[in-house]
């Protein structure tokens, strides 16, 4: 760590830090340098103070367990706000906070919030600092946990300090007293109230998505506004490189709401017969992709530098690459702890002795989960065993397919292809998913999550749809758009499709369709495969038919629900309404 007067940080940034410190009133200010020594010192201090637990070094090298407050365990959408002078900027899906209320929050909860504490200053870059995608930010925080997480998920510290100019995103986080009723995560992508010089404010929370301001707050909510203004896309999407047996790389992005298979797909390894035939995969991003249009092509990159991913359900059968990733240099949040000092979560082999649950209670497995359903692991990208050589390419990689997908037990086929760009935008805009533990609310409820951006779009969702339409209008080489659903169930509740590595069979068809017009059957909702490679897969012909069955009556009901949803949104672009009417007509409705 560096004292502020020891750094070579931009004078404008230094002045901002000093002015913020006057309001927060810390006892000291340290600028984070991003070194291993800094990480180790902070981690050791947290362990000494009982704020973190060092895990079994033999099995989980340089890894730790952090337990959050029991009321601070997930993104809190009802306490997440967009502020503007005009409510219409924010739109129907975001929570609006007037500018004068922001000023009240600033004075009530941030004034003196760091009294007696150290103010950590974290300079970070989203995307490689040398990249055309690069965007810079500074987060100030009183939380060592936040500093350690940003060590892993961003490029931060010394290598970034000298590159920060006059334009950077200003984030201020204060742990506060963790009062859920006074939790605020506020974004100001346009104007700010007088005396509040910040783009993002977060208070009375220390949970990842609420406190790691580089992630959803900057890389999606703030960046999505900037992307609209500058003509690019900031998306809640994985980015995967698939290399075919001829050695050609294909790049696929995919938007999936939390717990809908996004991380598992990003980390997919082909089944053995595919590997033997010469197929391979490499990860670029598991969560966020920035896409710029260059010479009519969609060029994508991962703005982040690490993983902050849900861990329950992860094991060597479901995701061996994730297990390799989290075996070292990892911060676990809200998992269980065995008596031997190993982390434990549902999905791992049972432990029959007593262990500690995520709240620190010693007990045996049974009843309430040992690990919180939204427990997480934070690891650097370089932990991943099959990281693409192009993950830091300053030009980005060319996208050939965009996937939309959600967790649906019925109706939605395993895979289908949109008829055209606008139809694909309609499909993404109307994605319906079953609610997960990653956001607060009743698990299992169905809600619309357009492009998996419902919690993350920083402006009016109808303008966001319009932006997608306009991007398509000015792009010569648009990727094809596909919709996938790994979660269709039989009447007895069991999954029809085996999922996980077998999802690669669907990717093979998608890649084929990006450059061919055959092996597809037209249906009222899009093109489905005429045939998939199912060799060696234990699945009945009846199950395959069910995976692709188009239930017209069910779809008519779906269209009624979409109609209600559009009415709630209000000013939906005409192009999407046109696709809606065409879909109804194809369904004979």
UniProtKB/Swiss-Prot annotation:
Q: Active site at which residues? A: 260
GO BP terms: namely: cellular response to glucose stimulus; gluconeogenesis; glycerol biosynthetic process from pyruvate; oxaloacetate metabolic process; propionate catabolic process; response to lipid; response to starvation
Q: Does the keyword Nucleotide-binding apply?
A: yes
| Catalytic activity of the protein | oxaloacetate + GTP = phosphoenolpyruvate + GDP + CO2
Functional pathway: Carbohydrate biosynthesis; gluconeogenesis
- How are cofactors bound according to the entry's free-text note? Binds 1 Mn(2+) ion per subunit.
What molecular functions are annotated in GO for this chain?
GTP binding; manganese ion binding; phosphoenolpyruvate carboxykinase (GTP) activity
Q: Main localisation, per the record?
A: cytoplasm
Which family does the entry's similarity section mention? Belongs to the phosphoenolpyruvate carboxykinase [GTP] family.
Question: Known HAMAP family for this protein?
Answer: PEPCK_GTP
Role description: Catalyzes the conversion of oxaloacetate (OAA) to phosphoenolpyruvate (PEP), the rate-limiting step in the metabolic pathway that produces glucose from lactate and other precursors derived from the citric acid cycle.
Instruction: Specify the protein name.
Output: Phosphoenolpyruvate carboxykinase [GTP]
Q: Which organism is this protein's natural source? A: Thermoplasma volcanium (strain ATCC 51530 / DSM 4299 / JCM 9571 / NBRC 15438 / GSS1)
């Amino acid at each position: 760590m560096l004292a502020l007067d020891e750094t070579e940080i931009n004078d404008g940034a230094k002045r901002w830090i000093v002015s913020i410190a006057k309001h927060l009133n810390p006892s000291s200010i340290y600028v984070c340098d991003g070194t291993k020594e800094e990480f180790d010192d902070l981690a050791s201090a947290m362990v000494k103070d009982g704020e973190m637990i060092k895990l079994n070094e033999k099995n989980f090298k340089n890894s730790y367990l952090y337990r959050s407050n029991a009321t601070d365990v997930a993104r809190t959408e009802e306490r997440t706000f967009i502020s503007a002078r005009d409510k219409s900027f924010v739109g129907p899906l975001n929570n609006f906070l007037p500018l004068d209320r922001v000023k009240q929050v600033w004075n009530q909860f941030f004034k003196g919030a760091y009294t007696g504490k150290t103010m950590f200053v974290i300079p970070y870059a989203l995307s490689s600092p040398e990249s055309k995608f690069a965007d810079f930010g500074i987060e100030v925080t009183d939380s060592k946990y936040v500093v350690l997480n940003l060590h892993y998920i961003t490029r931060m510290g010394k290598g970034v300090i000298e590159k920060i100019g006059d334009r950077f995103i200003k984030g201020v986080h204060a742990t506060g007293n963790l009062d859920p009723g006074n939790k605020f995560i506020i974004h100001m992508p346009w104007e700010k109230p007088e005396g509040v010089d910040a783009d993002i404010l977060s208070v009375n929370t220390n949970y990842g998505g609420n406190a790691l301001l580089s992630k959803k707050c900057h890389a999606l909510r703030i960046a999505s506004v900037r992307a609209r203004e500058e003509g690019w896309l900031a998306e809640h999407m994985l980015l995967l490189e698939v290399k075919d047996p001829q050695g050609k790389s294909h790049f696929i992005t995919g938007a999936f709401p939390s717990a809908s298979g996004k991380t598992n797909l990003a980390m997919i390894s082909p089944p053995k017969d595919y590997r033997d035939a010469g197929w391979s995969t490499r990860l670029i991003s598991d969560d966020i992709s920035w896409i710029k249009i260059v010479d009519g092509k969609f060029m994508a990159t991962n703005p982040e530098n690490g993983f902050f991913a849900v861990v329950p359900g992860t094991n060597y059968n479901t995701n061996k690459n994730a297990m390799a990733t989290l075996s070292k240099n990892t911060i676990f949040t809200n998992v269980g702890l065995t008596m031997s000092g190993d982390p434990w979560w549902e999905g791992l082999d049972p432990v029959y002795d007593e262990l500690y649950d995520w709240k620190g209670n010693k007990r045996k497995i049974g009843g309430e989960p040992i690990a919180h359903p939204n427990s997480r692991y934070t690891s650097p990208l370089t932990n991943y065993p099959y990281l693409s050589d192009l993950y830091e390419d300053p030009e980005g990689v060319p996208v050939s397919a965009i996937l939309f997908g959600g967790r649906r037990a019925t109706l939605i086929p395993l895979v289908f292809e949109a008829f055209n760009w606008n139809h694909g935008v309609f499909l993404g805009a109307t994605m319906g998913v079953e609610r997960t533990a990653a956001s607060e609310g009743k698990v299992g409820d169905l809600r619309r999550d357009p492009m998996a951006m419902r919690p993350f779009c920083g402006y009016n969702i109808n303008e966001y749809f319009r932006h997608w339409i306009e991007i398509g209008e000015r792009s010569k080489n648009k990727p094809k758009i596909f919709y996938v659903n790994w979660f269709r169930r039989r009447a007895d509740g069991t999954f029809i499709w085996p999922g996980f590595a077998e999802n690669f069979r669907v990717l093979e068809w998608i890649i084929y369709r990006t450059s061919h017009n055959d092996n597809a059957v037209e249906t009222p909702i899009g093109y489905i495969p005429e045939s998939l490679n199912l060799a060696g897969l234990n699945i009945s012909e009846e199950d395959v038919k069910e995976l692709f069955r188009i239930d017209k009556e069910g779809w008519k009901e779906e269209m009624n629900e979409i109609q209600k949803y559009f009415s709630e949104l209000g000013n939906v672009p005409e192009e999407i309404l046109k696709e809606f009417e065409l879909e109804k007509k194809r369904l004979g409705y």
